[in-house]
Amino acid sequence: MTAEQPTGELSLRIERRRDANGGDSSSVATSQFHRGALRVLRPYYADDSGQATYTVINPGGAYFGGDTYQLTLDVADNAALRVTTQSATKVSKTPQGPAHQTMHITLGESARLDYVPDQLIVYENGSYRQDTTVDMQPSSSLTMSEIITPGWSPSGERFTYTELRMRTEIRVCSELFAIDQLRILPAEESVTGIGFMEGFTHIGQLIFVSRMVAQPAVADALAELVRTSDTHSGLTHAGRPLPLIDDAPVCLVVRSLAHSTEAIARLHEQATDIVKDA
C-alpha cells in the first residue's frame, strides 16, 4: 500500500430510521465504505432495541509490519451501533515497523456505541499502536472493551513482543474529557512482576462514558461485580470536571489482570449488561 492509502479502511454512518411501513425504528447504515484489508458482514439485530451489530473482518488474517488501518464510526442522533470482530486481531512480527490502527468515533445526541472486539494477540517481535479519538455529546453513551493477550513464542515465554501502545482520547462537546493510555514495552523492561502484570498474563480494560453510570445503583453493582469476579480487577472513576456542560456524562473504567481471555470477556459481558439494563 502507498503512504496515501491505508492497508485497510472502513467507514460507517448509522442513523435511526423507521421501516417502510412506518413501524418500529431501527439503526441502519446510511453510508458505508470499505477498502483494502477491512470488511464488514451484513448487520444483525440481537434484540428489539433497534441497535445494529456490525462484524468487522480482516481477510488477510493478521496485522503485519508497516500496516495501517483506519476506522471511522459516525453514530447519528438516537442511533445505536455495536461493533465487534469475527475473530481475534493478531499482530505478527513487524520488522518493517509497527502495525498501526487509528479510529475516529463521532456520537450524536442520545447516540450509543458499544465497541467490543475480540482479543488482541501480539506475537513475538510484534509491535502495535492504536490511537482512538471520540467526539460525543453529553447524552451519548459509549462502551469500549479491549482484551490483550500475549502470543505464543517458540521459547515458551509469554511477553516476547516488542511494544504495545494504545491511546484513547474522549471529548464531550469538543471539550477534552478523558485520556486513557496503555504502554507495554517488554523489549525494554520486565513486565511480568510486581507493579505491572503481577504474574498474570492477560490485560482487560473496559471504558464506560454515560450519564447512566452516574446512578449510584449502577456504580455499586459494577463495584460488586468487580470485587467478586475471578479476575484481579479494579473500578476507577475517570474524566475531568466539565463545569460548562450541563448534566455531563460520567466515566468509569474497569481494569483487569487475569490468566485467560475468557475470564476477562465474562467480566466485560456482565458489566456491559449492568449498564445496558440501567
Task: Locate the predicted segments by residue.
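Short, surface-exposed recognition loops or helix-turn segments adjacent to catalytic cores
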Residues: 118-120, 145-150
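N-terminal, charged/glycine-rich beta-strand/loop interface patches
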Residues: 1-119, 124, 131
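A structural signal for small-residue-enriched, beta-sheet-centric alpha/beta enzyme cores
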Residues: 148-278
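A short, polar/proline- and glycine-enriched secondary-structure boundary/capping micro-motif
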Residues: 39-42, 92-98, 125-127, 153-157, ...
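Basic (Lys/Arg-enriched) interaction patch that binds polyanionic ligands
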Residues: 125-126, 131-133, 144-147
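Repeated loop/turn-to-beta-strand initiation elements of outer-membrane beta-barrel proteins
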Residues: 112-113, 140-142
